[in-house]
Amino acid sequence: MYLPSDDSIFLANIVSSYHGILALEIGTSSGTILRELSKNFRVVVGTDIDFYSLKHMLMMSRNERVICCDAASALHNVKFDLIVSNPPYLPSNINHIDKSVDGGPTATEVSIHFLTSALDKLTGDGKILVLVSNLSDTCKLDRFIAKNNLVMRKIAQKDLFYETLQIIELTT
């Protein structure tokens, strides 16, 4: 389970300004973002591939719903006003793989996988918020966004001593 850190708190603060009916968090882990979403959305759903993260989340949840699945693969015939993800975004280390932080060889593979599973889950005016790091291949992510005709807007940036985090908003 990924424990909340600077990135989670950064995203939670941004998420707090969004409102709607249905919200989804892909890769909910400890539930920090999901709990923030539950303050401004009527129904919130979190997905995670790690059963133990979800078990921990359920012990602390109020009205959030969680599903153990890969990205948004188990969700059908439902559209969300907001989809949020703080995906694993660090380049993978061949000698030590940690699925809670490793985003693949270019550090964008997991982000792209999450986004691919989310695209058909948005309402017409729905939005996707995703956290990205300058440590990942942002050009590869930009190509994916362009290929899928998504509109990208940078919402916020946070400079840390070891990386720069950005939250981007995607719309169709």
Language model segments and positions:
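C-terminal beta-strand of the catalytic ATP-binding
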Residues: 89, 170-172
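Glycine-rich, phosphate-binding/catalytic loops in enzymes
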Residues: 40, 99-102, 146-147
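Mobile active-site "lid"/loop adjacent to the S-adenosyl-L-methionine
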Residues: 87-113
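Short aromatic-enriched loop/helix-cap "lid" or pocket-rim segments at secondary-structure transitions
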Residues: 80, 95-97, 141
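Conserved Class I SAM-dependent methyltransferase catalytic core
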Residues: 110-169
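Soluble or luminal CAZymes and related metallo-dependent hydrolases
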Residues: 7, 49, 106, 110, ...
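Conserved SAM/SAH cofactor-binding pocket of Class I
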Residues: 4-76, 82-85, 91-92
